[in-house]
Amino acid sequence: MAALRVQPEAQAKVDVFREDLCTKTENLLGSYFPKKISELDAFLKEPALNEANLSNLKAPLDIPVPDPVKEKEKEERKKQQEKEDKDEKKKGEDEDKGPPCGPVNCNEKIVVLLQRLKPEIKDVIEQLNLVTTWLQLQIPRIEDGNNFGVAVQEKVFELMTALHTKLEGFHTQISKYFSERGDAVAKAAKQPHVGDYRQLVHELDEAEYRDIRLMVMEIRNAYAVLYDIILKNFEKLKKPRGETKGMIY
């Protein structure tokens, strides 16, 4: 089979990209990763992430508890109105109205923390993607013998893949919190006499607070693990067979 012919100018563009990627990776390891480890460690020590009494996180839930007598009278009037009113359209419009309590806001304390956390999630995933691409471009052509360095590359790549999967899950976790909290608030508004629904809203807030702290820890740890394992194996990762440069297989 004839060898693939690559135009010199095309190869030059790939080489420029490769060199730029190597420079960025070395800058990440040399300064950016240590800086992020320090910043996230400081974030974890802030009072905002060290609330001992989680009941302080409780957000106002402006859903009035109904008076049983008034509710009974209201229900009777509603039944009478439905008997008299045969207009299905009007009935449908009434059913679409929101709860009498008005809008219920998010938990501002949780939202403020998430506004700080989400850029960190985006950043660590992007940096991990960059370093993973750099590593893949160091993998040499497949051939027999002297594959210890390649095995090291594969182990590090497996670690990076696992980290990426975990970090990507944080976005879903945050969305799930808002979805579940919204459902709990809707149930509390629809059945305001059920105290469990009210308490469920507060329980979800407390659980999310704990998760936010854990996510910050995981991001810090991701930077630390990447920094440590790449630094310890840098020569093997960059030159698995002692070659001057890696080749894409």
Curated annotation (Swiss-Prot):
The keyword Ubl conjugation does not apply. It comes from the Eukaryota. One of its GO terms (molecular function) is endopeptidase activator activity. The keyword Hydrolase does not apply. Residues 68-98 have a biased composition (Basic and acidic residues). This is Proteasome activator complex subunit 1. Keywords: Proteasome. One of its GO terms (biological process) is regulation of G1/S transition of mitotic cell cycle. Residues 60-102 are annotated as: Disordered. It comes from Sus scrofa. Implicated in immunoproteasome assembly and required for efficient antigen processing. The PA28 activator complex enhances the generation of class I binding peptides by altering the cleavage pattern of the proteasome. GO terms for cellular component: cytoplasm; nucleoplasm; proteasome activator complex. Transmembrane segments: none annotated. Heterodimer of PSME1 and PSME2, which forms a hexameric ring. PSME1 can form homoheptamers. The gene is PSME1. Belongs to the PA28 family. The lineage of its organism: Eukaryota, Metazoa, Chordata, Craniata, Vertebrata. PANTHER family: PROTEASOME ACTIVATOR COMPLEX SUBUNIT 1, PROTEASOME REGULATOR PA28.
